[in-house]
Amino acid sequence: MPVLHNRVSNEELKARMLAETEPRTTVSFYKYFTIDDPKAFRDRLYIQLEQYKVFGRIYIAAEGINAQISVPNNQFDAFKTGLFSAHPALDQIRLNIALEDDGKSFWVLRMKVRERIVADGIDDPTFNPANVGQYLKADRVNAMADDPDTVFVDMRNHYEYEVGHFQNALEVPSDTFREQLPMAVDMLDDIRDKNIVMYCTGGIRCEKASAYMLHHGFKNVYHVEGGIIEYARQAKAQGLPLKFIGKNFVFDERMGERISDDVIAHCHQCGASCDSHTNCRNEGCHLLFIQCPSCAAKYEGCCSTQCQDEMKLPLEEQRAIRSGRENGMKIFNKSKGLLQSTLHIPAPAAKDNAE
């Protein structure tokens, strides 16, 4: 039996990836379709993708597939042929090619079977995820962005919205998609007659969100086809003005793709204009936050002096301090003025709070 998971350390895998000479292309794709046996489908696809030396993160569920990967350029055509033939629903599936890419976005292939390909918290047997809103290509997105009877709704997390969004888009301020869905219904209840345009990074969240809004009685619901990534690609290819300002946050080593030259966020430590996310260098923290080059030097890549000091302790002392701390992703939320971890970060500057 072939080994259907990785057995090599992250450190070694990352070193191997960095030593590669063959360029890679970062790609994302998703598809809602019925998979009768997700585990068997996952194992077959793993064997196939491993032979093409694909790295990345793929979630598979009975409702479909969600993938963010990198593919060696010399294997790309073979990868596409294999993917398109893996299931009838995947034939000619749209592949979102990264807008900014150094090929170093992933260093290992991880494929997991989950209950849902995006955690939505929906527990309603009458909900039909196939009944989605109308797709919008870039030209129609721009036309609707200038329409006063249209509201754009960002279905991404608050830290994604913070560094880039469509002009005048409504933020649904939450850390999770499952929280955003009912919040969006409540926030838009008084403007049901307007055109509602949902968008997200690559389309997977806004497609399901559009179905959720229709399920709750909204009529004029749309979503941006292929999300921000495909919108930006189409707009630039067609010479259209960009209605998305700032940076598109991505969930890999790049942490962002520049869409426009606008920098709309601020350093969480000093308030300087900045939209570069990073993770705190303290192994016991890894807080996701925005840090400018000056603060990166001052705090040595840490989110606070506490983490800066802790990082310099002997490893055994660091492990003892970390013992008992909650694990999981920690995110600085400027809108709440809180740090969702056991550690501390100074309050953001006043001008950051005023945003």
UniProtKB/Swiss-Prot annotation:
Keyword ATP-binding (UniProt): no
Record-annotated Rhodanese domain positions: 146-240
Known catalytic reactions: uridine(34) in tRNA + AH2 + O2 = 5-hydroxyuridine(34) in tRNA + A + H2O
tRNA processing among keywords: yes
Primary enzyme class: oxidoreductase
GO biological process, one term: tRNA modification
EC number, UniProt record: 1.14.-.-
InterPro entries in alphabetical order: Rhodanese-like_dom, Rhodanese-like_dom_sf, Rhodanese_C, TrhO, TRHO_N
Keyword set, alphabetical order: Oxidoreductase, tRNA processing
Coiled-coil blocks: none
GO MF annotation terms: oxidoreductase activity, acting on paired donors, with incorporation or reduction of molecular oxygen
Active-site residues per Swiss-Prot or TrEMBL entry: C200
HAMAP family, A to Z: TrhO
Protein family according to the UniProt entry: Belongs to the TrhO family.
UniProt cross-references to PANTHER family, sorted A to Z: TRNA URIDINE(34) HYDROXYLASE (PTHR43846:SF1), UPF0176 PROTEIN YCEA (PTHR43846)
Function: Catalyzes oxygen-dependent 5-hydroxyuridine (ho5U) modification at position 34 in tRNAs.
Name of this protein: tRNA uridine(34) hydroxylase
Organism: Pectobacterium atrosepticum (strain SCRI 1043 / ATCC BAA-672) (Erwinia carotovora subsp. atroseptica)
